[in-house]
From Swiss-Prot:
Residues 2-191 form the Glutamine amidotransferase type-2 domain. The modification Phosphothreonine is found at residue 545. This is Asparagine synthetase [glutamine-hydrolyzing]. It catalyses: L-aspartate + L-glutamine + ATP + H2O = L-asparagine + L-glutamate + AMP + diphosphate + H(+). GO terms for cellular component: cytosol. The gene is ASNS.
Amino acid sequence: MCGIWALFGSDDCLSVQCLSAMKIAHRGPDAFRFENVNGYTNCCFGFHRLAVVDPLFGMQPIRVKKYPYLWLCYNGEIYNHKKMQQHFEFEYQTKVDGEIILHLYDKGGIEQTICMLDGVFAFVLLDTANKKVFLGRDTYGVRPLFKAMTEDGFLAVCSEAKGLVTLKHSATPFLKVEPFLPGHYEVLDLKPNGKVASVEMVKYHHCRDVPLHALYDNVEKLFPGFEIETVKNNLRILFNNAVKKRLMTDRRIGCLLSGGLDSSLVAATLLKQLKEAQVQYPLQTFAIGMEDSPDLLAARKVADHIGSEHYEVLFNSEEGIQALDEVIFSLETYDITTVRASVGMYLISKYIRKNTDSVVIFSGEGSDELTQGYIYFHKAPSPEKAEEESERLLRELYLFDVLRADRTTAAHGLELRVPFLDHRFSSYYLSLPPEMRIPKNGIEKHLLRETFEDSNLIPKEILWRPKEAFSDGITSVKNSWFKILQEYVEHQVDDAMMANAAQKFPFNTPKTKEGYYYRQVFERHYPGRADWLSHYWMPKWINATDPSARTLTHYKSAVKA
């Protein structure tokens, strides 16, 4: 996890413009660099580094002697870089995984390059010989990338929007900033004056498609067919591989553990893989909650079962409320469910950074979208409609869950890794017949649970534990985070403010006092930037007015049972 920043065709003083890049310094606490492009005095790269791989020679922009005309600034991890290096017999100058991008590009061009990358990434690649600039982002948008471009060809890119909003450009007093779409790359012409012109924007990968790099994977041979035992065996193989490849780091590994199905499977598999790799330190797992929260109790059981070095972080309602302003600033969104769920993750990330030496943190993000884990999937009218909804959620992850996961950890200089969003695992899961993936017998993620039924990876009671939203599970059923927030915003937003909400906020008008409060905080930090969020996250098929699982009938009946 790092922070990247680049300008092309700036007409303002670069030393002043570079101050904007310091707004993402939290993403790279170990080192930073600014570098002008040779021959283009108005083009510049900025980089904030979190040293995870090759701490000695990992500074960016990456340049190697063999390709003096290539400049690469990227944030990500390319898990198959050694495999690609060996297969094509590339001669590396560093041990940095991103160097593979330069070699693949020289060999086959940008499309082949980006399709061969197994990992998560956001990059800016400059080819001064051919006068081209390339932008690219991974399939699910696990690594963030924002872009601002004017009609006269000024281009600015950054890992977070906050690094772009104060940039100056003579032709545009208000610079439009927008997220770069996941699963896409863009080709731009570089003009002699340093400005650019967009040539094409290409969608290179759909989450259902088996990625091109699968041809070179080390995964065990999968068995054909959709018999249940075959599918379960294939899923176990792919999930183990997804975790194993993500061990690539020179820093200590830890794992978020809420005690839910997803984080528990990740933690248990991770600990098993660390032992097989003969890593010489115990796995640290981290849980957060208020006293006697369901998550803390469940996480404790999992930690005892797998034998991790477990940490419990307690917080109270006052600490949660006080964190809201910092959280919304870090997130760059006012989406209700994203803000709610981010408070716990933000506070636990803060604890990890201050009190431990774990830097690379695993989590269970992405599973709910992939495996139809949200409670409202019980109401899907058909397996096909459930499949469509699952794919929609995956397409929009970059606006919600992976945004939350990235910003709350990056705010404290941590790197998050998400095995459930592995290309091979997710594409295989989505290839299964729709009827195999829907909730069964009143239980969501039935196939995933059944897959690990006989593995003894985690306790049975955790394997079959009903779905809890992270923002709900960190507090008690009697006094949920949802309820605490409602009581707080009731004193912050009055009825007159709500009556005038449509006039004050005509775009994405908040419908609740909680939504109004978050929007107020967001506008204070990012005035006029409401379009960064295209729509609120909301359950489907149930006419919900609030995204909390605690408000759903299925959840209430499950609690009573």
